[in-house]
């Protein structure tokens, strides 16, 4: 279905050109997160711009689902990262008193023996390893939950606008999240980011406003 199919369908036409531009710039900045050093800051700015764009589009089209889903995704990922990093840091704290050393023995002359300690390195205890695994699991779980909500956000945008690239964004993002532990996951996420840029670039500047609805969201929307 083409994006223009939502125009002239018997409703008020609204201008979303500003939101389109913000979403496009935000998506480009989010992709720039792969740049060393400044990537994190650029991604953060990009996510904020995308949130603002989705909020504006939702208000103008009487549908807040894209914004709500995307906001939940950001919260889930952020909280999981904070908690996961704290747990991983605790793993090294509880293991800080445990060290291992490498020893070499040399016989210099008959009857004499010299032991040289080459290095001493931190050693994770059983508790430390357990905390390390738990922390990594929390981060991975947050990424999956966040990916689910992002998928729902882009699927909602596809239903609202008819821009098929949003549907492709959701599809590649979800499979990328599920395979994030292997290389193909990163490739799929990159493809998803590219489709996201294409989606906002193809988004028309004007869309037909939908009538307000007070229907209760379906249960599978995974709301909290």
Language model: regions and residue ranges:
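Functional transmembrane-helix hotspots
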Residues: 85-109, 201
């Amino acid at each position: 279905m083409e994006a223009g199919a939502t125009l002239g369908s018997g409703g008020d036409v609204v201008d979303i050109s500003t939101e389109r531009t913000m979403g496009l710039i935000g998506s480009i900045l989010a992709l720039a997160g792969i740049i060393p050093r400044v990537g994190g800051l650029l991604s953060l700015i990009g996510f904020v711009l995308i949130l603002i764009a989705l909020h504006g589009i939702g208000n103008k089209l009487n549908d807040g689902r894209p914004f709500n889903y995307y906001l939940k995704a950001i919260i889930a990922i952020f909280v999981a990262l904070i908690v996961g990093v704290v747990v991983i840091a605790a793993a090294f704290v509880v293991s800080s008193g445990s060290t291992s050393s490498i020893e070499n023995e040399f016989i210099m002359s008959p009857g004499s023996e010299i032991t040289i300690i080459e290095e001493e390195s931190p050693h994770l205890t059983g508790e430390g390893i357990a905390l390390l695994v738990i922390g990594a699991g929390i981060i991975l779980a947050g990424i999956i939950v966040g990916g689910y909500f992002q998928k729902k956000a882009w699927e909602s945008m596809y239903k609202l606008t008819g821009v098929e690239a949003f549907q492709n964004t959701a599809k590649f993002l979800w499979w990328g999240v599920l395979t994030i532990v292997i290389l193909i996951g990163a490739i799929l996420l990159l493809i998803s980011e590219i489709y996201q840029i294409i989606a906002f670039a193809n988004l028309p500047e004007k869309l037909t406003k939908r009538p307000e609805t007070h229907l209760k969201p379906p249960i599978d929307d995974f709301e909290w």
